[in-house]
Amino acid sequence: MKIVVLTLFDDFVRSYYDFSIIKNALDKKAVELEVINFRQYANDKHKTVDDTIYGGSAGMLLKLEPLVNCLRDIKQNQFKDPNKIRTYLLSPQGEVYDQNKAVALSQSDHDLILIAGRYEGFDERIYHYVDGALSVGDFVITGGELAALIVVDSIVRLLPNVINKDSLSSESFNNYLLDYPMYTKPYDFEGYKVPDVLLSGNHQAIAAFNQQEAINNTKMKRPDLYLKYKSNLK
């Protein structure tokens, strides 16, 4: 899989790729990641990427030309199959991104282009040139770079040979459940003790205990997810 992030702050995005799981995935050649500053595709001598908004609204809006020029160029010249690419804006107006979407994208045979917005966002006509938009939540951040990195990270860690399969199967949101509570040494800290079953050595009992704790944890902390879990059992 190849994932390209289009941004005005390429150094910021690229710096994240030097750490942890993303770096391991790159070292293993499990994924190809590229970052492109779309300012270079602006037509004027000042490399202008934003302009005022029709109708008098406050702020500046990203111009269409640099983004569309960039998309056309990289789709033709930087991917193996131009017909197997999905392109998404990162926008609070997009489809809410969740673990199910991450799994679907990680298992797709399509490469990915993510466009990080800035200022007041995108000229509405950009939707004619992309497959959709993704939102990482109902809040506003300064730019789409952090959102793009969330999407990249969540996909890459699901790709083959990046993370141990057993670790993935027990993570939060698997089957709509949060992770079960976990403990480390010391056994007793100021009267708060580790549940004795976890020290029993009985793997079947431990698995059953952890499963029930995951259910209880989800019901208490995320009742919305718990309802999805219950519905999924039917």
UniProtKB/Swiss-Prot annotation:
Its EC number is 2.1.1.228. S-adenosyl-L-methionine binds at residues 117, 136-141. One of its GO terms (biological process) is tRNA N1-guanine methylation. It holds the Pfam family tRNA_m1G_MT. GO terms for cellular component: cytosol. It is found in: Cytoplasm. It comes from the Bacteria. SUPFAM superfamilies: alpha/beta knot. It catalyses: guanosine(37) in tRNA + S-adenosyl-L-methionine = N(1)-methylguanosine(37) in tRNA + S-adenosyl-L-homocysteine + H(+). Disulfide bonds: none annotated. One of its GO terms (molecular function) is tRNA (guanine(37)-N1)-methyltransferase activity. Belongs to the RNA methyltransferase TrmD family. Specifically methylates guanosine-37 in various tRNAs. This is tRNA (guanine-N(1)-)-methyltransferase. It comes from Mycoplasmoides gallisepticum (strain R(low / passage 15 / clone 2)) (Mycoplasma gallisepticum).
